[in-house]
Amino acid sequence: MTESVRLPAASLKPSTVALPGSKSISNRTLLLAALSDNVCEIHSLLKSDDTDRMLEALDKLGVQIEHLAEGRLKVHGTGGRFPNRSADLFLGNAGTAFRPLTAALAVLGGGYHLHGVPRMHERPIGDLVDALRIAGADVEYLGNEHYPPLHIGKRQDCGERVIPIKGNVSSQFLTALLMALPLTGQAFEIRMVGELISKPYIDITLKLMAQFGVQVANEGYRVFKIPADAHYHAPEHLHVEGDASGASYFLAAGLIAATPVRVTGIGANSIQGDVAFARELEKIGADVVWGENFVEVSRPKGRAVQAFDLDANHIPDAAMTLAIVALATRQTCTLRNIGSWRVKETDRIAAMANELRKLGAKVVEEAEAIHITPPETPTPDAVIDTYDDHRMAMCFSLISLLGVPVVINDPKCTHKTFPTYFEVFSSLTETAE
């Protein structure tokens, strides 16, 4: 029987939330530290299913990692060459582990088997594999063409130094290639073919690579130039920012409930694009205060939450939260340019449409957009399916702030990025029933 949690109709208390570490930064940092030529102590790393899969993989590849007090880790870099030249790596549904590891292992070469849960085998990886093959990699599909699982063999350097790659399905393909090619020691030019989505995630990658000693020239997000003789050298200590995508639920709660909520661990100078979510809330009625290590959202009681029609390409993960905020506007709202939702942990456009309809909303799906017309009052005690997608579970918790109880199936799917989410959320609320 499916486990579920019932959230009663609730009011929000003025609150401060210390965010867990960013998943995007955590897994990039682990891999870069493992490939460095020195030792790096990582602070505030996210503890979750996705980071566990990366840590397990690095262990199987022979990377020495010490677990210290207070969740700190000491990663002993391998100098850009994993000790174990063959391994069987199970990576769950962790795209932030699967894609970068695929590229790094393909560039280094060896005998590697990469696989995951069934959904991971439905998430495309062909654009990355095509680019890696141009760079001389030996990558074989073990199931359906263009999808995991994969076998990686020995790379043959064919001398090609200009690598085209598509970026319209997932920016993680470009991230993976950017992080892997410096391991060759050769100069490379990566050229985008067509549109590049989710550019802020590329900014995270480039800023982290720079912290690890590799400067990539970014020419208008069309051409990326990797210098010759590059190698990774880690900072002695690195602090992982709080998760800006995870912040979106609490910031949206502050807007919906017209109650101040502050999140700590991110701020005005965050390297994560999803901090822009707070700016989108500002446009539709929120008061936002920015600090160096916090963002605070509130709304005056007399000010309505305004409807929106938003191109959400710059905040694809946090934009899911806006689909719930739409119900507080009492008017039709639209999220556009969200085609990447289709190939995430689930088809998020279809899943969001299905579950919003259970609440009485009228929803129109398009290939890359969703139109949401809220009900007068959401249906009480709607049973929300979460599709093994952490963000579906966290988004729909906000329904309890709209005056009705809601039942969330499989709440433990939040373990992918935020294992304590429901405990934290409940601690911020008071039952209104």
Curated annotation (Swiss-Prot):
Where's it found, cell-wise?
Answer: Cytoplasm
**What keywords are annotated for this sequence in UniProt?**
Amino-acid biosynthesis, Aromatic amino acid biosynthesis, Cytoplasm, Transferase
Catalytic reaction equation(s)? 3-phosphoshikimate + phosphoenolpyruvate = 5-O-(1-carboxyvinyl)-3-phosphoshikimate + phosphate
Q: What pathway does this protein act in?
A: Metabolic intermediate biosynthesis; chorismate biosynthesis; chorismate from D-erythrose 4-phosphate and phosphoenolpyruvate: step 6/7
Query: E.C. number, please?
Result: 2.5.1.19
Question: Which residues of the sequence carry a binding annotation for 3-phosphoshikimate?
Answer: K23, S24, R28, S170, S171, Q172, S198, D317, K344
A GO CC annotation given for this chain: cytoplasm
Q: Where does the record locate the signal sequence feature?
A: none
Question: Does this UniProt record's set of keywords contain Cytoplasm?
Answer: yes
Show the SUPFAM superfamilies listed in the entry. Answer: EPT/RTPC-like
Can you provide one Gene Ontology molecular function annotated for this UniProt record?
Answer: 3-phosphoshikimate 1-carboxyvinyltransferase activity
Residues of the active site are D317
Q: Which residues cross the membrane?
A: none
**What's its top-level EC category?**
transferase
Q: Which InterPro entries match?
A: Enolpyruvate_Tfrase_dom (IPR001986), Enolpyruvate_Tfrase_sf (IPR036968), EPSP_synthase (IPR006264), EPSP_synthase_CS (IPR023193), RNA3'P_cycl/enolpyr_Trfase_a/b (IPR013792)
Biological process according to GO: amino acid biosynthetic process; aromatic amino acid family biosynthetic process; chorismate biosynthetic process
- Residues annotated for phosphoenolpyruvate binding in this entry: K23, G95, R123, Q172, R348, R391, K416
Q: Which domain of life is it from?
A: Bacteria
Q: How does it assemble?
A: Monomer.
Function statement: Catalyzes the transfer of the enolpyruvyl moiety of phosphoenolpyruvate (PEP) to the 5-hydroxyl of shikimate-3-phosphate (S3P) to produce enolpyruvyl shikimate-3-phosphate and inorganic phosphate.
**What is the similarity comment for this entry?**
Belongs to the EPSP synthase family.
Q: What is this protein called?
A: 3-phosphoshikimate 1-carboxyvinyltransferase
Q: Which organism is it from?
A: Neisseria gonorrhoeae (strain NCCP11945)
| Upper classification of the organism | Bacteria, Pseudomonadati, Pseudomonadota, Betaproteobacteria, Neisseriales
